[in-house]
Amino acid sequence: MSQEITQKDNNDHLVQSSDPDHPANMIPDLCRKFYNWGWVTGTGGGTSIRRGDHIFIAPSGVQKELMQPHNIFVLEFPTPKYPPSDRKYIRKPLDLKPSACTPLFLAAFERGAGCCIHTHSQWAVLVTLLVEREKGPGGYFEISNIEQIKGIPRGKGKGMMGFHDTLRIPIIENTAFEEDLTGSLEKAMEENPDTYAVLVKRHGIYVWGDDVAKAKTQCESLDYLFQLAVEMHKLGLPWVK
């Protein structure tokens, strides 16, 4: 059943805090950083944080560099992914729409993530195009013998990757509507249980981590590796030794 929320009972206190580490403050701060890095231009992309049984999600259609705490949606967790009308919003900005990324974020949280980031990084898009050209559909982005690989986990409780390891990131096909990516994202998660990221062809990437710091630093490390891979390709250098 759809849950009607009025201004009177909108639980605004859930997004009001002087603590800079509160999710309602962290999400706008992260979105501004990501905008300045070119990851979330034109209102694209999104960020979500889970704290206990609450999920804080950036809205749809708000310029990322202008986002404020009062723009943030709050969901109970766990909550159904589908249909959208069954999602348990306990705080909704009345003039905004929930992020179309919501069911994909929920898929990450169901795996135990504490934060999920979606970017439209140009480097992420470019590597999906290069993999498509070189390997065809179903290919993975793979790279080895690069120091920054050490910033990526091997898997839950398995420590971090090493210099000589080969990083493999699955790539899924894009869809006309963001929410329709959910099934293929979940399939990629199931087939690659140690991955913390999934690339979306001609679109961007989803990255998640145990907490905000881990999700952010993993996203930074991956973007560095994607940019490096594009430059290596220009020079005719292989990604995997």
Swiss-Prot record:
Region span, Disordered: 1-22
Biased composition regions of type Basic and acidic residues, renumbered to the chain: 1-12
InterPro entries named in the record: Aldolase_II/adducin_N (IPR001303), Aldolase_II/adducin_N_sf (IPR036409), MethylthioRu-1-P_deHdtase_MtnB (IPR017714), Salvage_MtnB_euk (IPR027514)
GO molecular function list: methylthioribulose 1-phosphate dehydratase activity; zinc ion binding
Record Gene3D superfamilies: Class II aldolase/adducin N-terminal domain
Reported function: Catalyzes the dehydration of methylthioribulose-1-phosphate (MTRu-1-P) into 2,3-diketo-5-methylthiopentyl-1-phosphate (DK-MTP-1-P).
UniProt name for this protein: Methylthioribulose-1-phosphate dehydratase
Organism: Aspergillus terreus (strain NIH 2624 / FGSC A1156)
